[in-house]
Amino acid sequence: FTDAQNSKCPHFYTVEDNALTQDWSEKLKEIGGSAFANPPYSRSSYHEKQAVTGVRHIMNHALAMREKGGRYVFLLKVATSETWWCEEADHICFIRGRVGFDVPQWFVPADENQVPTGAFFAGAIVVFDKTWNGKAIDYIQRSELEQIGKTFVEQAKWLVSRGVA
């Protein structure tokens, strides 16, 4: 779920790849690891009668992939009243504090009325993993989550500097 310009991971699906037609579990077996997505919250769109976006389609595909194995981690806005909200997830960790997002590099306002802003809303980390044995529901402070993220980035940089990653 990327335009490739804003990718944060070395392996990703673009709209041309259509993640909703891919076998994520096979890809995870190939690369060894877990999947992360911050999916688009846009309405469903289709290409040749096949969904390419839409959170409900994405959550349905995540559930299907969960059954095939693997860990699928999503950063989602909290929208428990929406039909796509993932009550079937194995773990939901609500983030205390609003989450902000950067405007994509490619975004060009159509006019002066279209002011670019990052979204700020309640978020949750949602995990689909049938081997999950932790709590079903939990909470984390945004500041704690940010610190964990910074630690992972530093570890990744260290591994790269050692030629390991």
What is the predicted role of each segment?
Residues 1-165:
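Class I S-adenosyl-L-methionine-dependent methyltransferase catalytic core
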